[in-house]
Amino acid sequence: MSKLRNLNRQFISNLKTHETVTNAKRNLILSILKSTTTKREARNYLNKYQNQFDFSDITFNNGVPSNSLEKRDSQRELFINRFLNKQNPFTNIYDDETKLQKIPLRLALFKIKFQSISLENWKGMAETFKRLIHLGISPIIMLDYDHLPANTFRNNELYMLNQTNKIMNILGKPTEENDLKTIIMRSLFTKKTINDKDLAIDNLESVLIPLYQGVIPIIQPIVYNASTCMQEFIDSNDLLFSLCSSLLTTKNVLSIEKVVMIDPIGGIPSIERNQTSHVFINLSQEYSDIVSELYIGFIKPEYRIFHMNNLKAMNKTLTLVSDKTGNDETTGIITTPDIMSVNNDQLNPIIYNVLTDRSIISSSLPTSHNRTPELSTSILKKGVDVNILDALNYPKAFTLNNLVQDGSVNKSKLVDLIDDSFGKKLDTEKYFDRINDSLATVVIVGDYDGAAIITWETCSKTNEKIAYLDKFAIASVNQGLPGLADIIFKIILQSHPNELIWRSRKNNPVNKWYFERCCGTLSNPGSQWKIFYTGDIFNKKIDKLKKQGIPGGVNIHGKMHQYSDITENIPPSFL
């Protein structure tokens, strides 16, 4: 009878455990769906991170059941057992008994300038770390001690140990179940010679095994110099770069998802945004321009040095990751302790970027709009190359035929991109003949991953030429890709800041996106088109009365007639 009673208790306990686990899974998925703004974002996140969780009874890809060895816990056990048995943990890690799907650790590297971080902020940051782990991210923390003098190693070492222990106590004690588990790592790197700048990790497993056990490594900026047999401090940015370089030697077991700098001065400042941060930086295109901007003198020299160091370090690190992995999936984030401590998925830029792979607001939103918020966070990507073609920088007549003949534009790739983006066939010869002599600007991103064509269109009533966004195309595989549409549209607005118009069918779902980026819209009842307009001229006073002209103002009534005349008279481009 007692055995039966024990079995009954065990059965009830198992039911409760199953219910708890099921509820946890359901709550996780619901929180993901709530925090992402589109189905595509939710799907992309779940496809990328689903194997970081034990979703054994939930499938995301056509109902295919997940192999038990494909789960992170199984991989942890295999990895650790091999290491303890003095085997190479990285050899055929996915080939025991069955071919296993690769399940890399999803890493986020945090470089934290911690001196002025308050206790309250640390507590909030600890909650952010917990949320990141809950979402499948494995954090690594590097504390920035660059403010210490370089000639007093012993005193610095004691200070570092004391500060790290304080931070570990704030983040949580390993004995407490719900707290974060952390471990201090020092002398992780070795310098072979006195002048050697290339640092190496002799025992990478010492970093990876804690990560597989759910423990956060806190790495001290101390290196062992093999030639002098002494320990030395290293610059925190050099530490970040060397850590990335070492981790990327084992790309089959990990991926570096985020590189995060937590700094009280925040993201990279922008003149355009009233010295608040650049929202998104496409480093391949904007790096040199932003460096030049920082030297204009709109910020104090002492702050400029810090921002320059952050920008250079992020560019160097993201370039390394991009070169070694062959992709642009790693995101850089520079933000403040205050912002990292925000415990709201849609307001915390780090959490939001994990879920959506983009910034909280769009970088192409007009800075002049009151509804566009000002931020202290910059999102950075190595990004894509951008080619901007216009009459000012072209030695011959700026026609499409000339651009094609001298190889500046690949006609077949451009046509393929437009066909793919719009889902219908371009009437190629007719379209190119129409725009050949009226070309204003051509923007080509990457290997025709996206493009824009802007033309000069003439109003039949006033003969005034106005810039018209004729084609805005993004390859279907890249549609929804974070940042690409923003990169192109931002260039479009910068190329024609004074006045720009475009049209879109009234039932186009993209119209909401367009509406957020324009100064106004026009829609004639009998037309299939919605007309959008923007430009600096609309920041001036608007003269709404035909008979009373305001000097320097805009006759909005006349402009609407011009825009309507132009857009209604442009012939269809597709077959």
UniProtKB/Swiss-Prot annotation:
Write one Gene Ontology MF term: L-glutamate N-acetyltransferase activity
* Principal localisation: mitochondrion
Q: Which GO terms describe its biological process?
A: L-arginine biosynthetic process; ornithine biosynthetic process
Recite the UniProt keywords alphabetically: Acyltransferase, Amino-acid biosynthesis, Mitochondrion, Transferase, Transit peptide
Q: Where in the cell is it found?
A: Mitochondrion
Q: EC number(s)?
A: 2.3.1.1
CDD domains for the chain: DUF619-NAGS-FABP
In Swiss-Prot or TrEMBL terms, this protein is called Amino-acid acetyltransferase, mitochondrial
**Species per Swiss-Prot/TrEMBL record:** Debaryomyces hansenii (strain ATCC 36239 / CBS 767 / BCRC 21394 / JCM 1990 / NBRC 0083 / IGC 2968)
Q: What is the lineage of its organism?
A: Eukaryota, Fungi, Dikarya, Ascomycota, Saccharomycotina
List the gene name. ARG2
